[in-house]
């Protein structure tokens, strides 16, 4: 799958537990805008309405000369057994459903979603500390040898 747009905050704010691929119901101008990479997934999330899954807060910029709602909810297309599994995990383990990236597979726009658990501020601080320590160790070893 060719990745078009990534949710850059997903791996920093959440601990990814499971991944799924879903299709998205889009309008023509939305497809063109996504292919031109005019979309933001930061702050986007998925929610259940009945037995259907929807993507919310994904902002697709208007394509040239088109008019429409840029931040409407979009239905996600998945098999029923996948939806049941996601709903069961979400309820029992109290997980969030977040979009990871939008890609193109066989000229069709696909969304990679994940069941994720939110990280605390302490977890994020520790992650930053570990990253800095690794960077400094690599820098020291580079200068040492």
From Swiss-Prot:
It is found in: Cytoplasm. SUPFAM superfamilies: Small protein B (SmpB) (SSF74982). GO terms for molecular function: RNA binding. GO terms for biological process: trans-translation. Keywords: Cytoplasm, RNA-binding. The keyword RNA-binding applies. It comes from the Bacteria. GO terms for cellular component: cytosol. InterPro entries: SmpB, SsrA-bd_prot, SsrA-bd_prot_CS. Its main location: cytoplasm. PANTHER family: SSRA-BINDING PROTEIN, TMRNA-BINDING COMPONENT OF TRANS-TRANSLATION TAGGING COMPLEX. HAMAP family: SmpB (MF_00023). Belongs to the SmpB family. Required for rescue of stalled ribosomes mediated by trans-translation. Binds to transfer-messenger RNA (tmRNA), required for stable association of tmRNA with ribosomes. tmRNA and SmpB together mimic tRNA shape, replacing the anticodon stem-loop with SmpB. tmRNA is encoded by the ssrA gene; the 2 termini fold to resemble tRNA(Ala) and it encodes a 'tag peptide', a short internal open reading frame. During trans-translation Ala-aminoacylated tmRNA acts like a tRNA, entering the A-site of stalled ribosomes, displacing the stalled mRNA. This is SsrA-binding protein. It comes from Mesomycoplasma hyopneumoniae (strain 232).
